[in-house]
């Protein structure tokens, strides 16, 4: 933190770059830890024991990871696919229907959301609508913390479902939560049913960011990102009234959107 006191009125104001505050993200689960743990226990029974994502050696394969940003260039994706015939396309649930609509069948779709399939997503869409059209060629990579209603829907529709474990503090015992990880090993709560030595995939709090960790775990090092839009030129008047925060947990509502500045240096 920087504190600057100007006692001479003839001095110029401090540069704007010194007034900027870096964006600091404190990730947290979107549902209570108990809810996530219950999801894991249920999915360990639903998912095939032999179809879990595990660590692969590094290879020269290429991959495309598609998030759900509004400025996704589908023509560029197709150009890459035509140039590299064996390239793999991994997407998130929100980009899955739009990819199909644009004639692109994803090799995989990564799913992480621990909330019910009947609920409304962060994009304002009922989650079940995102899985209305399902292509048998897509591998649906379902995190063990995913709500079982999603897993059951995919299984009922004869989808090719694979499981994976997303690392979160919810997997650890209360006394170990928040503690620094040593020797790249964590102790998982026994009651969750996750096998010892299971692959845990790290990354951000959304499926798109975990997708990078997923592809890295699968041995990919040449990854092309699409749809990772996190900014807009100007929020609408309606969006400016939107707030975020755990109100039930006692937090104060905060603006959902805020202005950021990107330094060119």
Model region roles, listed by residue range:
Residues 1-265:
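Metal-ion/cofactor- or nucleotide/acyl-coenzyme-handling active-site neighborhoods
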